Amino acid sequence: MEDMDATKRVINKLKAGASYFACGGYLSSLDKLHRTEIYNTLGFERLERKNRDIMRLYEECDCNWPQTFYMVLLRTMGGIDNKEAFTELARRVPYAAILREKMAPQNIEAMLIGATGLLELYQHDEYILNLKRNFEYLSAKYSIEAMEASEWKLTHIYPNNHPILRLSQITTFLVHTNNVMDRILECRTGDDVQRLFGVETLPYWLTHYTPAAVTRSVSKRIGRTKSDLLAINLITQMQFAYGSYITSESLRERALSLLENISAEKNSVIAQWNSFGPLARSAFDSQALLQLSFEYCKHHRCEECIVGRRILRQATKATQTE
């Protein structure tokens, strides 16, 4: 009875501290071997969950891997604020239409940007008027229905992350990249991913972040921070999912190696964990901690959590020796 009371007290204490990741102190006290064991469990859980998400998209895409990649690409480029809007855009402008217009970059840009419904929010210069005219023709050709502008979140968005600018970057990536699936499966390092996505936009966007608003000329290539996020949330996830699909352990290992050789994400959640010490050094570490945060801490699932169970086991042993 006393042991049960002690167990309950430990669990209640863990749950009370879950919202501010109180078990970070325990993680920081572990040696590298034991912390790696925990990260491996959590990291694989996250990869498997994302694998299931990708396979659901694969089914939605009629078992078409290039279309699946295209949907995950747009979803990832949308970031936290606009991932659902970008995913819907990928449904409305299918990859097959992109391939058919591959030799005409401005047509691809017209389809993607025109289908957002966002052009109506901005003044029209000659370039934007041409995009609109092209979209009217291409939307009839491919039966594309534009989204509502209200589906997009534009407030508190940095200029570099504006949906229209991101779509101009996606356009040049799709135009310049042949055999897309092969190229992403080949990536082994963060530099490989940077080279793959670091293509310059069409000239108009060098002096624009949004339509018709002229700025000084600045390169709009995807930067290293964004390319690392693409490596983490797109490239490695597709490598792991496709490797699982074709039962290629080497491809799954490539995904893991890439995660281990990219720096950890920088966000408020990881910063909170790192306040206990350098808990996230690589992207694999930070992905493991995100799994811990959102699947366990957020829902107070301490009894089911690998960290919570170890703390409970340690506390139980200490009680028994008293």
Predicted features and spans:
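A surface-exposed, charged beta-strand/loop segment in the N-terminal or early-internal portion
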Residues: 1-35, 322
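Acidic, carboxylate-rich catalytic segments that either coordinate divalent cations
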Residues: 275-322
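Hydrophobic, aromatic-lined core segments that form the binding pocket/scaffold
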Residues: 42-286, 301
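Short, well-ordered strand-loop elements centered on a beta-strand within folded domains, enriched
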Residues: 1, 83-88, 316-322
